[in-house]
From Swiss-Prot:
One gap junction consists of a cluster of closely packed pairs of transmembrane channels, the connexons, through which materials of low MW diffuse from one cell to a neighboring cell. The keyword Ribonucleoprotein does not apply. It comes from Homo sapiens (Human). InterPro entries: Connexin (IPR000500), Connexin_CCC (IPR019570), Connexin_CS (IPR017990), Connexin_N (IPR013092), Connexin_N_sf (IPR038359). The keyword Cell membrane applies. It is a multi-pass membrane protein. Gene3D superfamilies: Gap junction channel protein cysteine-rich domain. The lineage of its organism: Eukaryota, Metazoa, Chordata, Craniata, Vertebrata. Residues 233-294 are annotated as: Disordered. Residues 46-76, 158-188 are extracellular. One of its GO terms (biological process) is negative regulation of heart rate. Expressed in vascular smooth muscle cells. Found in heart, colon, and artery (at protein level). Found in cerebral cortex, heart, liver, lung, kidney, spleen and testis. PANTHER family: CONNEXIN, GAP JUNCTION DELTA-3 PROTEIN. A connexon is composed of a hexamer of connexins. Interacts with TJP1. The gene is GJD3. This is Gap junction delta-3 protein.
């Protein structure tokens, strides 16, 4: 029972990532398969070879007839079935633990690389969620494939009824030998019960796969919307950008001196000489006549 408890603890870790349908599948797996097979199946099928009796004393005939009647023991076939069904969920648990360890180791570095940037935090988170969802979808698909394969194998190998009588012919038996199976009715009931549990498990796997595919795209859209809203809120909380610097002022043109005005460094001229232009022209003839008179 220690092996069954260890397997149950591994499968129990899957429910952290599973929806409600996946948890129902886990209940069916733990109770109606592992528990029933560990407690009842071993007691029903443990003596099938010892109690397989043939009406001959020919050495090797009984073993050969038993091998032809049951190519693989029911009990071992179902054990192998449970192991293969448990492999995808256990691998997903190992992957989740590995990813959790890597994220815990690089959380501080990621926080230092992108402090206060929501888009840098939302994008890796969404990427990890998509990877985990794809891995879980793959595990459910592999589980469903294993379930259908073993249901078909059980129907082909054993059918749905354990016959109490088996007629065996061929070497090393000298003639047609009649062989008899112990407790055929009890074994038939158990075979039908296990096949029904397999059908229920397959239906739950199909429902879970459809649920994940149907709910995956809206959840991805909601996640993107949340990241966009967080980015917009962060942009609102940021301080306003500084105003742009004013353009450089153009150099102003200094007004030049008047055409008739003397420069600033010149001495002031006499009042009689301050007239210019036309006034100077009018005063010239009078001055000339005054000179001539002298």
């Amino acid at each position: 029972m220690g092996e069954w408890a260890f397997l149950g603890s591994l499968l129990d870790a899957v429910q952290l990532q599973s929806p409600l349908v996946g948890r129902l599948w886990l209940v069916v797996m733990l109770i109606f398969r592992i528990l029933v097979l560990a407690t009842v199946g071993g007691a029903v099928f443990e003596d099938e070879q010892e109690e397989f009796v043939c009406n001959t004393l020919q050495p090797g005939c009984r073993q050969t007839c038993y091998d032809r009647a049951f190519p693989v023991s029911h009990y071992r076939f179902w054990l192998f079935h449970i192991l293969l069904l448990s492999a995808p969920p256990v691998l997903f648990v190992v992957y989740s633990m590995h990813r959790a360890g890597k994220e815990a180791g690089g959380a501080e570095a990621a926080a230092q690389c992108a402090p206060g940037l929501p888009e840098a935090q939302c994008a890796p988170c969404a990427l990890r969620a998509r990877r985990a969802r794809r891995c879980y979808l793959l595990s459910v698909a592999l589980r469903l494939l294993a379930e259908l394969t073993f249901l078909g194998g059980q129907a082909l190998l054993y059918g749905f009824r354990v016959a109490p009588h088996f007629a065996c012919a061929g070497p090393p038996c000298p003639h047609t030998v009649d062989c008899f199976v112990s407790r055929p009715t009890e074994k038939t009931v158990f075979v039908l019960f296990y096949f029904a549990v397999g059908l229920l498990s397959a239906l739950l796997s199909v429902a879970e796969l459809g649920h994940l595919l149907w709910k995956g795209r809206p959840r991805a859209g909601e996640r993107d919307n949340r990241c966009n809203r967080a980015h917009e809120e962060a942009q609102k909380l940021l301080p306003p950008p500084p105003p742009p610097p004013p353009p450089p002022a153009l150099p102003s043109r200094r007004p030049g001196p008047e055409p008739c005005a003397p420069p600033a460094y010149a001495h002031p001229a006499p009042a009689s000489l301050r007239e210019c232009g036309s006034g100077r022209g009018k005063a010239s003839p009078a001055t000339g006549r005054r000179d001539l008179a002298i």
